[in-house]
Amino acid sequence: MNLHQTVEHEAAAAFAAAGIADSPVVLQPTKNAEHGDFQINGVMGAAKKAKQNPRELAQKVADALAGNAVIESAEVAGPGFINLRLRPEFLAQNIQTALNDARFGVAKTDKPQTVVIDYSSPNLAKEMHVGHLRSSIIGDSISRVLEFMGNTVIRQNHVGDWGTQFGMLVAYLVEQQKDNAAFELADLEQFYRAAKVRFDEDPAFADTAREYVVKLQGGDETVLALWKQFVDISLSHAQAVYDTLGLKLRPEDVAGESKYNDDLQAVVDDLVQKGLAVEDDGAKVVFLDEFKNKEGEPAAFIVQKQGGGFLYASTDLACLRYRVGTLHADRLLYVVDHRQALHFEQLFTTSRKAGYLPENVGAAFVGFGTMMGKDGKPFKTRSGDTVKLVDLLTEAVERATALVKEKNPELGADEAAKIGKTVGIGAVKYADLSKNRTSDYVFDWDAMLSFEGNTAPYLQYAYTRVQSVFRKAGEWDADAPTVLTEPLEKQLAAELLKFENVLQSVADTAYPHYLAAYLYQIATLFSRFYEACPILKAEGASRNSRLQLAKLTGDTLKQGLDLLGIDVLDVM
């Protein structure tokens, strides 16, 4: 159920009874549970509009809520706020419904969409580095939530598998194989660096590399076969990282830049024919009045270089047209570094004008900030090199395993390693997903691996604590009527019933930290409930009801963490 929507519906009916049906309710959870569960903040605005006393108008609304089946009490506070407390019977009934539902009371959207989500999308011919972490895990979490809410999600890994760097790499590979017939491409990163040194220092080699670019773009079979070697090994490296992270990205989700090669000229010609692209100094340019510089000149969105070469803009236009026209997207999401914001705004504007992006199709740039080191600079190794993602994840597992062994010295090596992997990978992902994605954040091993505070280990431990209760509980009646008498029982019940609303917010806004914050709230509330309301020592209806709340807490934590791409453990 959508608790927020249900309460808002009751409040709207009370607004109508008070003669202010056209005014928005403005419903929010209370900041202090002692004041109730929700607060109506819309009366002041309505009173100003109707030229009435806000407290008197608020009292009319509160009176209209008397005897309500959902709301137990409505009290006017301050200049015209109304604090609402929900009926325990209403909460209890909905807890029962959620417990008997495989989706824990979360309804699917009544307006399902086909959502194409572009995320991860590393440049190939190099191993993935920490800069690829945010797009990969943010995109994965958003796609999981959208899917869970009933949408059809098409994941697109728009890898950089085309461009001038491949001419350089092919030239170096040919050179190496000439000197050593048994040469194999093992260390991708080392190979790329060596090829770059040759390209920068040897003009003759650079000329050869450029010739290979021409051959590659011309479809030369021998060069294409060598190019495919780089693509295949790069993708296998990437897939290994995705599997370690537990992402849902699969090889069939790869749709690289090369996929759109045959469409690029057609797109440029179409833009010219529609009068959108014009020639400017030999290049084809779309001038956008919506993006003017300080001098008032329209921004130049270049779609074809002087000499006929193509750019990211050309590929992205062809790609967007394909996603709408062939994949039939209702909504497009691009999970990309925030520094690309202007490019995507211009891409969307150009696409709207060209008719590639109809008004009934949504398109959003899902930007994110930078992962920083403790020194406040982008996260690097001590020597200043980019950190390989695989090395970061290996270190996460090693650190977590050491921590697990320290806390549980009696654990066998295999069990400690299994728990260590779940905790370590979960910690890295949650440290990112729990932050507002638009912000930069500091990567801190000690903070993210802590079992206290807003961390994955804390939430994972909260789940194991629930499982521990049920290992000791023995027989109990899961179908017994739920009875809520203690304040923390009601508070926990009300919070558990907000799950659908939170997930809908994530689906609408593409902000996974809303879900992380909710799960942390559930875990901390359960901890307080656990201390204040003995579960196993309680008797009769109270014992069953508290076990029901514990069961739904565990289910919600497990499902919620899964939607963030994080595993749980029964024991840790």
Curated annotation (Swiss-Prot):
Q: What is this protein called?
A: Arginine--tRNA ligase
The enzyme's E.C. designation: 6.1.1.19
Which family would the database say this protein is a member of? Belongs to the class-I aminoacyl-tRNA synthetase family.
The species is Neisseria meningitidis serogroup C / serotype 2a (strain ATCC 700532 / DSM 15464 / FAM18)
> What keywords are assigned to this protein?
Aminoacyl-tRNA synthetase, ATP-binding, Cytoplasm, Ligase, Nucleotide-binding, Protein biosynthesis
Against InterPro entries, the record matches this protein to:
aa-tRNA-synth_I_CS, Arg-tRNA-ligase, Arg-tRNA-synth_N, Arg-tRNA-synth_N_sf, ArgRS_core, DALR_anticod-bd, Rossmann-like_a/b/a_fold, tRNAsynth_Ia_anticodon-bd
User: GO molecular function, one example?
Assistant: arginine-tRNA ligase activity
Its main localization is cytoplasm
Where it sits in the cell: the answer is:
Cytoplasm
> Where is the motif ('HIGH' region)?
122-132
Instruction: Give the matching PANTHER family.
Output: ARGININE--TRNA LIGASE, CYTOPLASMIC (PTHR11956:SF5), ARGINYL-TRNA SYNTHETASE (PTHR11956)
An example Gene Ontology biological process? arginyl-tRNA aminoacylation
Q: Name one Pfam family in it.
A: Arg_tRNA_synt_N
Q: What class of enzyme is it?
A: ligase
Extract the PROSITE patterns matched here: AA_TRNA_LIGASE_I
Gene Ontology cellular component?
cytoplasm
Coiled coil spans? none
Top-down, what is the taxonomic lineage of the species of origin? Answer: Bacteria, Pseudomonadati, Pseudomonadota, Betaproteobacteria, Neisseriales
Q: Is the tRNA processing keyword given for this protein?
A: no
Which catalysed reactions does the entry list for this protein? tRNA(Arg) + L-arginine + ATP = L-arginyl-tRNA(Arg) + AMP + diphosphate
How it assembles, according to the record, is: Monomer.
